[in-house]
């Protein structure tokens, strides 16, 4: 693809871009600065990697204007090189698929399947399901009764969408994820567990990514809700009645207990654990392995177990490294105190 076509595309998607160099260069693929070849486009978004810019073989580099003077390579000047790189990668790596229904698929007659959608090998589509325009339902996936899949959403393979769930537009669900499984709801009577039917739904907004083997449980009574523009990594567990606010990011192995309300633009690093029946303020960030045991009322960064403001946690970590010396010092002081006490008593 000619570089000038890439420039035009970036402008079409709302990115301000200035070309410095030859717009007739052919670009075939994206690449990192180190691995790039002459027909590749790469990017620089971190000043720590400037040395890679100096030696790259990339034909084109996406960079911030402040780095323009550091290279003689043809470059595209943009405010957010990483975002521009993502859009160029989408352009050069389109996910094309045919339209139609594979012969091995089992589709109920009452389902409404858009003509532009693809229903793949061994897919099962239940009663009254709606599949929108340009959807891709990959091999082995199951969409059960009364569920809705919005247009341009992709179920890669072996994805399970249980009954009466709603998935918005332009979603991306990786293999093995389960949407709408039974919530962990049981009542105990005299030592015996009795299942509570989970009659809520899972409602997922637009442009939501759900990673490999992630699980989002349906609500017990109210819906489990994932608002638009969220990204959910592999092996995440979201329990019944949880709500995740717009634009939040959840890394691998994070677990949410039931009925927790998460605000907008929150970030959860790997293996964070979130207690049930609490609320979390907008724009809260939780470090890896944080244990969120209580409601978070103020935006900010939190770490540790139980999670506390990160600056406070860092101070505690510094102090904890000296605990052994402190214990020895206290023991020594106690000994001196006892000796002084004995001396006073003898006097």
Swiss-Prot record:
SUPFAM superfamilies for this protein: Trimeric LpxA-like enzymes
Please give a single GO biological process term from the UniProt record: lipid A biosynthetic process
Question: Which cysteine pairs make disulfide bonds?
Answer: none
Q: Which Gene3D superfamilies match?
A: 1.20.5.170, Hexapeptide repeat proteins (2.160.10.10), MurE/MurF, N-terminal domain (3.40.1390.10)
Pfam families to which the protein is assigned, alphabetical: Hexapep (PF00132), LpxD (PF04613)
Pathway, per UniProt? Bacterial outer membrane biogenesis; LPS lipid A biosynthesis
Q: Tell me, how does this one assemble?
A: Homotrimer.
Q: Which family does it belong to?
A: Belongs to the transferase hexapeptide repeat family. LpxD subfamily.
Any idea what this protein is called? Answer: UDP-3-O-acylglucosamine N-acyltransferase
Q: Which gene encodes it?
A: lpxD
């Amino acid at each position: 693809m000619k570089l000038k076509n890439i420039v035009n595309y970036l402008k079409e998607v709302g990115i301000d871009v200035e070309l410095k160099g030859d717009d007739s260069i052919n670009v075939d693929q994206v690449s990192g600065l180190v691995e790039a070849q002459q027909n590749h486009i790469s990017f620089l978004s971190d000043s720590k990697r400037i040395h890679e810019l100096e030696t790259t073989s990339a034909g084109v580099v996406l960079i911030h204007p402040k780095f323009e003077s550091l290279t003689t390579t043809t470059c595209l000047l943009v405010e957010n090189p990483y975002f521009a790189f993502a859009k160029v990668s989408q352009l050069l790596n389109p996910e094309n698929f045919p339209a139609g229904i594979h012969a091995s698929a089992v589709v109920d007659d009452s389902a409404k399947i858009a003509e532009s959608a693809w229903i793949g090998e061994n897919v099962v589509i239940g009663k009254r399901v709606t599949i929108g325009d340009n959807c891709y339902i990959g091999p082995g996936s199951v969409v059960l009764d009364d569920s809705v899949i919005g247009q341009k959403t992709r179920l890669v393979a072996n994805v399970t969408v249980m009954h009466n769930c709603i998935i918005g537009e332009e979603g991306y669900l990786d293999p093995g994820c389960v949407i709408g499984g039974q919530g962990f709801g049981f009542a105990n009577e005299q030592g015996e567990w009795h299942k509570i039917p989970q009659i809520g739904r899972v409602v997922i907004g637009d442009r939501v990514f759900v990673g490999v083997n992630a699980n989002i449980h349906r609500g017990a009574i109210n819906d489990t809700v994932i608002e638009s523009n969220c990204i959910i990594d592999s092996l995440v567990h979201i329990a019944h009645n949880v709500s995740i606010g717009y634009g939040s990011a959840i890394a691998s192995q994070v677990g949410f207990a039931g009925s927790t309300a998460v605000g907008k633009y929150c970030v959860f690093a790997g293996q964070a654990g979130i207690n049930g029946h609490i609320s979390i303020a907008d724009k809260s960030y939780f470090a890896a392995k944080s244990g969120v045991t209580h409601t978070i009322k103020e935006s900010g960064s939190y770490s540790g177990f139980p999670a506390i403001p990160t600056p406070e946690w860092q101070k505690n970590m510094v102090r904890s490294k000296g605990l052994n010396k402190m214990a020895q010092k206290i023991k020594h002081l106690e000994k001196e105190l006892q000796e002084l006490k004995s001396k006073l008593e003898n006097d």
